[in-house]
Curated annotation (Swiss-Prot):
It comes from Oryza sativa subsp. japonica (Rice). Residues 92-118 have a biased composition (Pro residues). It is found in: Nucleus. One of its GO terms (molecular function) is DNA-binding transcription factor activity. GO terms for biological process: regulation of DNA-templated transcription. Residues 349-359 have a biased composition (Gly residues). Homo- and heterodimer with other ZFHD proteins. The homeodomain differs form the typical one by having namely 4 instead of 3 extra amino acids inserted in the loop between helix 1 and helix 2. This is Zinc-finger homeodomain protein 10. Residues 243-306 bind DNA. It holds the Pfam family ZF-HD_dimer. Residues 333-348 have a biased composition (Low complexity). Putative transcription factor.
Length: 359
């Protein structure tokens, strides 16, 4: 007989904590490997001990050939030698969603209606050919209505009815031409298809360009010109223009006393003279501010400053009087009056003997 030896299996003990951890690590490795991640530049600060900041410049994590997925400590970069945790982890970007289908563009707006076209008239012969039918139709209607009108009017009105009927026939014949032209006109051609960018002129614009509206436009131009001359002034402006500024009026005695006070003060107000000015203003009967303004306005009139210069400028701008005409001056040294007197004396002495040149 064979002896059956009981074999007991010992669980594998791992240094990082039991057999369950290995199984859990295997189960977790699958989703980690399924979700791939990209590791970019290295962010390790090599100057942290010095209180600064310096990186090695590695741009992307490169796994080392000796790296083992089961040993996390072996996951170092082959370029900079730093662990993978120092590199910036960039998860794989999710796939871009499908492009959304844009809605179809809206249909173009319908073209505007075409402008009204003038009606086409048939020749006169066609209108005359259709007119008798309308005349017969109108006379038949009047014959149907005639018995009732005869009973109302009596037998004495037949002649008037016949005359009125003749007039109606003539009117019907005149109107029938117009009706025939409208009814016998051929079918209108379908309106042309216009492009979306074409904008026909409005009816009122077409009418305004006609010759019939020219007088109306010309008549409206004077009113437009009168309106363009300028808007009427607002009512407030008229009242402000009519309102006059209040001016203080002084008596001759007040003017003399204020002139005397101004000359006493030297036509200048100073702080030391405030008491004198207040007392004199009360005696004169004017306020201190009014006296100050009067003195400022009349200072140049009495001192001969600005007013004197103004009068001198006005005198210089006045035209000069023309120089006097000297009638007594002569080139030969004798006056004009003396020469005239000598000539008169010579003429008188000669008498009828004639002039000295004649002898």
């Amino acid at each position: 007989m064979e002896a059956v030896v009981g074999v007991k299996y010992r669980p594998v003990v791992f240094p990082n904590g039991g057999a369950a951890a290995a199984a859990a690590g295997k189960s977790k490795a699958t989703p980690a490997s399924a979700t791939a991640a990209v590791y970019r530049e290295c962010l390790k600060n090599h100057a942290a001990s010095l209180g600064g900041h310096a990186v090695d410049g590695c741009g992307e994590f490169m796994p080392s050939p000796a790296a083992d997925a089961a040993d996390p400590a072996s996951l170092k970069c082959a370029a900079c030698g730093c662990h993978r945790n120092f590199h910036r982890r960039l998860p794989e970007a999710p796939p871009s969603p499908p492009l959304l289908a844009l809605p179809p563009p809206p249909p173009p707006p319908p073209p505007p209606p075409p402008p009204p076209q003038p009606q086409q008239h048939l020749p006169r012969t066609a209108a005359v050919a259709v007119a008798p039918q309308l005349l017969l139709h109108g006379s038949h209607q009047r014959r149907e209505q005639s018995p009732e009108t005869d009973r109302v009017r009596g037998p004495g009105h037949h002649h008037d009815d016949d005359a009125a009927a003749d007039d109606d026939d003539s009117e019907d014949s005149e109107m029938s031409d117009y009706d025939d032209d409208r009814s016998a006109s051929p079918l209108q051609a379908p309106p042309p298809v216009l492009s979306p960018g074409y904008l026909p002129s409005a009816t009122h614009m077409l009418l305004s360009l006609g010759s019939a509206s020219a007088p109306a436009v010309a008549a409206s131009r004077p009113h437009a010109a009168a309106a363009a001359m300028g808007p009427p002034p607002p009512p407030g402006a008229a009242t402000s223009a009519s309102r006059k500024r209040f001016r203080t009026k002084f008596s001759p005695e007040q003017k003399q006393r204020m002139q005397a006070l101004s000359e006493r003060l030297g036509w200048r107000l100073q702080k030391r003279d405030e008491a004198v000015v207040d007392e004199c203003c009360r005696e004169i009967g004017v306020g201190k501010g009014v006296f100050k303004v009067w003195m400022h306005n009349n200072k140049h009139n009495f001192l001969g400053g600005h007013s004197a210069r103004r009068s001198a400028a006005a005198a210089a701008a006045a035209p000069l009087a023309p120089p006097p005409v000297l009638t007594d001056f002569s080139i030969n040294g004798s006056s004009t009056h003396a020469a005239a007197a000598d000539h008169a004396a010579a003429t008188a002495s000669g008498g009828g003997g004639g002039s000295p040149q004649s002898t």
